[in-house]
Regions:
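Short acidic helix/loop segment immediately C-terminal to the autophosphorylated histidine
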Residues: 69, 101-108, 116
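C-terminal end segment of the histidine kinase catalytic
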Residues: 270-305
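A conserved beta-strand-to-alpha-helix junction within the catalytic ATP-binding
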Residues: 146-161
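Membrane-proximal HAMP signal-relay module
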Residues: 1-79, 97-101, 137, 244, ...
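Conserved micro-motifs of the catalytic ATP-binding
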Residues: 140-145, 178-185
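Short helix N-cap motif at coil->helix boundaries in the Bergerat
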Residues: 152, 232-243
Length: 305
């Protein structure tokens, strides 16, 4: 993150042989740059207005510093949040390991409880790590995206049947016609988005609440909508639901609330495909969340995004 600053400082030192500005002025600029490090990313270069050439350069550098500071802060916050999320399952595993060591040999009930809890926490950690790796690859632009032409209604049907198998006591209502709705996208990633939205609707809905899955076509786009009859989202929370590690209900148990990364992943996928999200929610009534993708003729040839 800080490498550009080091390069700028070196460049400023070399500029004295290439410009009519004095060596003293350029060395002063280089000195200001050298003072900026990870602990002082909020520092900015301040030069007198009379030094027009240097001032234009300083303004460009300050703008770059703003971007670096924002990216660095986000990175540090992400690492801090990830560490916090991993700390809890590790503590639970350690606690049950101690329980096993003390009582496991003589108490079958304690043995089974500990094994179940350790497996559950290990699975949660695995899911969290996989999601973190996905977002890291997305941030580094190394996450593969392999688009193919397919019918979005067929994919929605697959997701709906899977949800019905997993949550056999819930009511899922499909809403789409017989006409195909073709798109060109990474089928696995779009399926992942649908699963994330469906799982959230189930998670935040009462047992007797219905979940709707709609697929519709509009001019140039395909729309997928998941609607529930759940708790809804407070107006102040809607702008943050795609933030990493954000949970709409902070009081919920961590296992019920999930990792707080699902919607961040969903947004990355949809953004990468040139689409966007639309969210409508009312507390005590439910949430309707849609994502739109560019539509494509069924005969569209595969090509990389």
């Amino acid at each position: 993150v800080l490498r550009p600053l080091q390069e700028l400082a070196a460049t400023a030192s070399r500029l004295s042989s290439m410009t009519h500005m004095s060596r003293q002025e350029l060395e002063a600029l280089a000195g200001e740059l050298e003072k900026i490090n990870a602990k002082h990313l909020d520092s900015r270069i301040d030069l007198p207005a009379t030094q027009k050439e240097l001032r234009a350069l300083a303004q460009a550098i300050n703008a770059m510093l703003d971007r670096i500071n924002k990216a660095y802060s986000a990175q540090m916050r992400f690492v801090s949040d990830a560490s916090h999320e991993l700390r809890t399952p590790i503590a639970v595993i350690q606690g049950y390991a101690a329980l096993l060591d003390r009582w496991g040999k003589d108490d079958p009930e304690a043995l089974q409880e500990s094994i179940h809890a350790i497996r559950s926490e290990a699975k949660a950690m695995e899911e969290l790590v996989e999601q973190l790796l996905f977002l890291a690859r997305g941030d580094n632009d190394t996450q593969p995206v392999k688009p193919v032409a397919f019918d979005l209604t067929v994919l929605a049907g697959e997701v709906l049947r899977e949800e019905e198998m997993i949550h056999q006591d819930r009511v899922f209502l499909p809403r789409w016609g017989e006409a195909p709705i073709p798109v060109r996208a990474d089928q696995g990633l779009i399926k992942q988005v649908m699963r994330i939205l469906m799982d959230n609707s189930v998670k935040y809905s009462p047992p007797d609440g219905r979940v709707y899955l709609r697929v519709t076509a509009q001019e140039g786009y395909a729309r997928v909508t998941v609607q529930d009859e759940g708790m809804g989202i407070a107006p102040q929370g809607i702008p943050h639901i795609f933030d990493r590690f954000y949970r709409t209900d902070q009081s919920r148990d961590r296992r019920t609330g999930g990792t707080g990364l699902g919607l961040s992943i969903a947004k990355w996928i949809v953004d990468r495909h040139g689409g966007w999200f639309e969210v409508v929610s009312r507390e005590g009534v439910g949430t309707r969340i849609s994502f739109l993708l560019p539509s494509a003729p069924a005969s569209t040839e595969e090509e990389a995004l």
